[in-house]
Amino acid sequence: LLFGKSRIGAVMEQHYQNLIDETAEYLEGSELTRKRLNEDDRSMRIQSDYIWQYSRYPVHENTTAEYFQVGDDMFPVLVHELEQAKHFIFIEYFIINDGVMWQTILNILEKKAKEGVDVRLIYDGFGCLTTLPYKYDQEMRRRGIKCEVFNRFRPILNIIQNNRDHRKICVIDGWTGFTGGINLADEYINQRKRFGHWKDTAVMLKGEGVWNMTAMFLYMWGIVTRTDTSLDFGNYVPHRWHPNDFPGSGYVQPFCDSPLDDEIVGENVYLNIINRARNYVYICTPYLIIDNEMMTALCLAAKSGVDVRIMTPGIPDKKMVFLLTQSY
């Protein structure tokens, strides 16, 4: 049995809260945007306000979004955008594995670092435990890339080992951002066949909404380096390097959840979406392990006439998880 809260967790939580307090002004968002959202869709304003209050990330306008239904479509666009970088590149991923995808990206990162671009990389210590060499972060630094490992894996019994960084974020110059389910490994772009044709999705944002993703990275950078990154925030806002207006209609609100508080923002957002659905709920997920509250919401939506469909892989990458998924 493990009792109490780890001291490491307490220190991390306090440091994170200090960063939040010191940078609150950068995440106030636009009251005019919130007012327009309220006029366009009161229900969405309520959802947006919840996200803002409990994840601290505001809603934005002036942002375009492009959806990629497989990694094969996303990868060439990512490469193109990386090659255009002039000021900074922030990359944060759970899994990085050597191969066509990573070597292509790494070559660009090295080139950009030599050009004076601020290139930073965060990868998860457990996610990359068997895919990257030991002390790979030191190799990255030798190549001019600022690199940190999130929660480096240590073979000891410690509850903190369960805290993992599953994010997939790439931010370029503050106004171009990629996220989704695609890690930096060849199977995600179907250059390597592991479990049939690999389907994971991604989204590219361009515009003011990318600021939320930049802030997420800077907060994490402050945590893994145990430094004060609050002074960095003003240097990376979207309009610092892009003085012109951004195109785009509608609203975007990238956000993240945190293990350092008791508010399950991610699940609550999904529950709100499902409970407010009127026509359909379509879910595509590699793993389906849900609690009673989520199951009740999905079943109630279906019983109320909403078209509820869930698609999961037919070829599993984790057999135990696959069995649990089938049980639902």
Describe the function of each predicted region.
Residues 182, 286-287:
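Active-site metal-binding loops of divalent metal-dependent hydrolases
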Residues 315, 324-328:
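C-terminal structured domain segments across diverse proteins
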